[in-house]
Amino acid sequence: MVAKDQKPILVKNSDEGLIIKKISKSFSGRPVVREVEFQFKCGEAIGLLGPNGSGKTTLFYTIIGLIKPDSGSIILDGEDITDLPIYKRSKNGIGYLPQEASIFRGLTVEDNIKAILEILEEDKQKVEEEIDHLLKEFDIDHLRRTPALSLSGGERRRVEIARCLASHPKYILLDEPFAGIDPIAVGEIRELVSHLKERGVGVLITDHNVRETLTLIDRAVLIHEGSVLIEGEPNDIVGNEDVRKVYLGDRFSI
């Protein structure tokens, strides 16, 4: 859980947002993503959803910088970042948490966060101050000297998010955050996403657990056969007949 008495460091955001503009991608001549467009701003949680083979994963990796689109552009606060590699996108404000554990298992919790901060900040006192703040904000101060290898799934995720926030991202992209975790950890993920929004961080989630995803996002973009089938609030998505036909089924509810 997130500490309630620790004020988060708010993101200095822009009104321009993250814009996905007519992104297309083909593999071996087969179109996978077809002129997809949507945008979101800091403080919003957006779900990128769709059936298997819809193109959503390719699109997600294109936004991260792992796949280069054939056409279209990705605009971050007015700057075209389409051709930037993933590490430069990180410097510009896009954080990424993969489905797989990304924690440095050989380090303690404190040193996991310090490893990022020492790259970004030369002032050792400021490094220590921010470590203290993040440890308290995410209620992991008692785990400060605990080896990362011994953390539970929920604890590990909190450390990974705290470490990601050490680079002061404006947006965080979460890949399958609900995969392979127990109900208690699901509740923690929901709380963490809410906390990121309070911080002013924009959150983009792609996950096969559509029910959990729809209950915590503001809007969803549903991809079908490489194109946007519908974009809207969760209730709009669930109530759409085409969505039920190709993705949710008639009995789905949230």
Residue ranges and their predicted role:
Residues 64:
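Helix-to-loop junction immediately C-terminal to a conserved catalytic motif
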Residues 114, 125-143, 191-194:
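Conserved ABC ATPase "signature" region
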Residues 49-51:
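The feature captures the beta-strand-to-loop junction immediately N-terminal to the Walker
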Residues 147-151, 155:
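Conserved ABC ATPase signature
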Residues 172-176:
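Catalytic Walker B motif of ABC-type/P-loop ATPase nucleotide-binding domains
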Residues 168:
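Conserved catalytic motifs of ABC-family nucleotide-binding domains
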